[in-house]
Amino acid sequence: MQPRIHMPLKIIMRLFYIVLFFLISSCTEHKINYYKTETPKINLNEFFNGKLLAHGIVQDRSGKVIKRFKVDIIASWKDDIATLDEKFVYSDGSKSSRIWKLKKIGLNQFEGTAGDVEGIAEGETAGNAFYFVYDLNLPVDDSTYVVNFEDWMFLMDENTLLSRSYMSKWGFDVGEVTLVMTKTL
């Protein structure tokens, strides 16, 4: 017969393993290939071509909406390089712009650059999804912070793209951006 002192230890160890399992499974990386069978299939050459209009919100890490914005985008391709000229207007009346250069480097692989992006952005498509990661110089008040962006874009129909961007700094979540882009005629 085992002493009774071991029974609580067994329960504690079981609880420890259950918690450890959930912690490990919650850290499982979101994979682009999960979406490879989803339709409609995204084709960046087709969607990012012509005029687009986007509306979005920025949320802080608690989920509070801290900014709303509209973006007018003019997109074009020359060979395997896209130019996305973005003009932002925020709910407080402020404005900004960004010009992305996207380069197709493989069947489903892309690289991107922009004036406020550190280094090279990396992207990949599968099914209806486009996964895009980069470090952005983000102005906040009188300072600029380098923030990691992890964009997940999903083609909803031939004219609509839904985007969720997760922002982090030193591995900690700092906010999210939700955006809907529509092609204009």
Annotate each predicted stretch with a short phrase.
Residues 35-51:
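N-terminal helix-cap/turn-to-beta initiation motif at the start of protein domains
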Residues 150-185:
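Glycine-rich, aromatic-bearing surface loops/beta-hairpins
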Residues 55, 59-140, 152:
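Central antiparallel beta-sheet cores of small beta-barrel/beta-sandwich binding domains
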Residues 48-56, 163:
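A short, Trp-centered hydrophobic/proline-enriched beta-strand micro-motif
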Residues 1-11:
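N-terminal secretory signal peptides that target proteins for export/translocation
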Residues 10-19:
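Sec-dependent signal peptide recognition
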Residues 23-26:
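C-terminal motif of bacterial Sec signal peptides marking the signal peptidase cleavage site
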Residues 28-30:
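Bacterial signal peptide processing site
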